[in-house]
């Protein structure tokens, strides 16, 4: 039985074994702590499936675990592997009750009881336990890569969102993002309930939400499209050299405004197939509800994650400015 099937059938912990050079410990269902016997100087959290129907990152992490188990990939750093929303994965849904990636930093307490509220509390707990591990707490380099795929297609297929923080991101982290061959970086400037923001704020990790392409069902992903990102992840874990950037220049965007849906009358005035990072004309009314209208105003001319179907109180889109770098 393949590892993905074992994960979905709640059997992975009983069947997955590793070489003696790796100390493996399951902290919760779908949460695996891996510590090398030879102490590393970096601690990594790599997560996928925070949204259950974003399958390509889950398949990539399964492949990574298979190579570690076979001994074909060496473990040189402390790693916490997280498969986020397992019940949603099993039903090919984004979430069962509420969006898990809006709940971190204790925000889950503001949501009704349900699958995601319980999982957010559990994931916060296991990350605390990981960073309290003596071999982990002694490291001064902490990174978090939260792997996602997007609901819609994009002008920039692969990009990363960086959480708002008062300290600069390390040069090494930014170079790794550059060399992973993503197309764009998006900088948040407000706090959020995302997993990446939680790791940044609570543990001082260099953290990002990495969008790898359009969401597809299990088994329908062409994983060769993500090979450079996969190689970059393997390089992090094994301390192997990754190849330099191949693509054109990395673009940088700043989040200027969030479109927050607060009423059932909310509408987006763009076609359903509008691509992420579409540039819109000055003065265009992109969204409205009974008491508010959102119009495009320079420099925030690019739309990201437009979604009129979100629940009231949640973000229905981001308006971005392109930084000239």
Swiss-Prot record:
Lineage of the species this protein comes from: Bacteria, Pseudomonadati, Pseudomonadota, Gammaproteobacteria, Enterobacterales
Reaction equation(s) it catalyzes: N-succinyl-L-glutamate + H2O = L-glutamate + succinate
Protein name: Succinylglutamate desuccinylase
Cofactor: Zn(2+)
EC identifiers of the protein: 3.5.1.96
Family matches, as Gene3D superfamilies: Zn peptidases (3.40.630.10)
Top-level class of the enzyme under EC nomenclature: hydrolase
Keyword Metal-binding: yes
Keywords: Arginine metabolism, Hydrolase, Metal-binding, Zinc
């Amino acid at each position: 039985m393949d590892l993905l099937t074992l994960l979905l059938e709640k059997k992975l912990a009983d069947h997955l074994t590793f070489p003696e050079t790796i100390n493996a410990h399951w902290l919760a269902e779908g949460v695996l702590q891996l510590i090398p016997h030879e102490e590393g100087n970096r601690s990594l959290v790599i997560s996928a499936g925070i949204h259950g129907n974003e399958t390509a990152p889950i398949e990539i992490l399964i492949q990574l675990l298979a190579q570690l188990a076979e001994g074909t990939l060496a473990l040189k750093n402390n790693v916490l592997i997280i498969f986020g929303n397992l019940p949603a994965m099993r039903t090919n849904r984004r979430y069962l009750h509420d969006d898990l990636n809006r709940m971190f930093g204790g925000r889950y307490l503001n949501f009704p009881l349900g699958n995601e509220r319980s999982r957010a509390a559990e994931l916060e707990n296991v990350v605390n336990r990981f960073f309290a591990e003596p071999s982990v707490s002694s490291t001064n380099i902490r990174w978090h890569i939260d792997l996602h795929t997007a609901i819609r297609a994009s002008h920039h297929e692969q990009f990363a969102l960086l959480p708002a923080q008062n300290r600069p991101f390390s040069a090494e982290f930014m170079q790794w993002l550059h060399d992973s061959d993503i197309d764009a970086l998006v900088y948040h400037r407000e706090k959020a309930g995302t997993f990446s923001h939680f790791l940044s704020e609570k543990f001082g990790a260099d953290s990002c939400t990495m969008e790898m392409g359009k969401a597809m069902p299990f088994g329908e992903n062409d994983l060769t499209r993500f090979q450079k990102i996969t190689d970059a992840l393997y390089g992090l874990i094994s301390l192997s050299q990754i190849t330099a950037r191949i693509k054109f220049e990395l673009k940088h965007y700043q989040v200027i405004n969030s479109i927050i849906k607060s009423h059932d009358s909310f509408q987006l005035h763009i076609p359903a197939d509008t691509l992420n990072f579409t540039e819109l004309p000055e003065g265009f009314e992109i969204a409205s509800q009974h008491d508010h209208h959102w119009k495009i105003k320079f420099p925030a001319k690019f739309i990201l994650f437009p979604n009129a179907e979100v629940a009231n109180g949640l973000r229905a889109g981001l308006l971005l400015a392109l930084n000239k770098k």
